[in-house]
Amino acid sequence: MATETKLSQMEEFIRAFLEIDADSNEMIDKQELIKYCQKYRLDMKLIDPWIARFDTDKDNKISIEEFCRGFGLKVSEIRREKDELKKERDGKFPKLPPNIEIIAATMSKTKQYEICCQFKEYVDNTSRTGNDMREVANKMKSLLDNTYGRVWQVVLLTGSYWMNFSHEPFLSIQFKYNNYVCLAWRTPSQ
């Protein structure tokens, strides 16, 4: 049932920045951009507009702060994403319990694990009636808001569903635990 989740254009930009910053100095320069474009056979004409858009201090480099400011992102969240992606590349992330199935997710495996296991714990400690499941949804929203910043949406359901939604970069998940499906995503707080 799990499918490869297509990243949004914003998520692709963030991943590109993190990949271009191979030396992890939180700065990319024109040479690094050229190498990246050559590696992926991208149009070299993209380089100057990228530098013009993000290089606010005109030093021909794009810092992580300039990049985040240009997209309205929080530097701390991009750093966290970078650390979690590195753990994934190194194979250092926890495995989900066998009775949890990821349907779709744009977030790191670490976040997936934390969220899914907490949901499982909440569900396992209830009678699984309507009121208890409403409380699980409330607890999940509170946990997500407090752990990953506001404003999260949480939907719990059984059965089929179709949806289309917008979310903050790398902050959406859809998963199944037993007969429950949990949908969670963070929307902009401003």
Swiss-Prot record:
GO terms for cellular component: dynein complex. Pfam families: Dynein_light, EF-hand_7. Residues 8-43, 51-77 form the EF-hand domain. Keywords: Calcium, Metal-binding, Repeat. GO terms for molecular function: calcium ion binding. One of its GO terms (biological process) is microtubule-based process. Adult and schistosomula tegument. Ca(2+) binds at residues 55, 57, 59, 61, 66. This is Tegument antigen. It comes from Schistosoma mansoni.
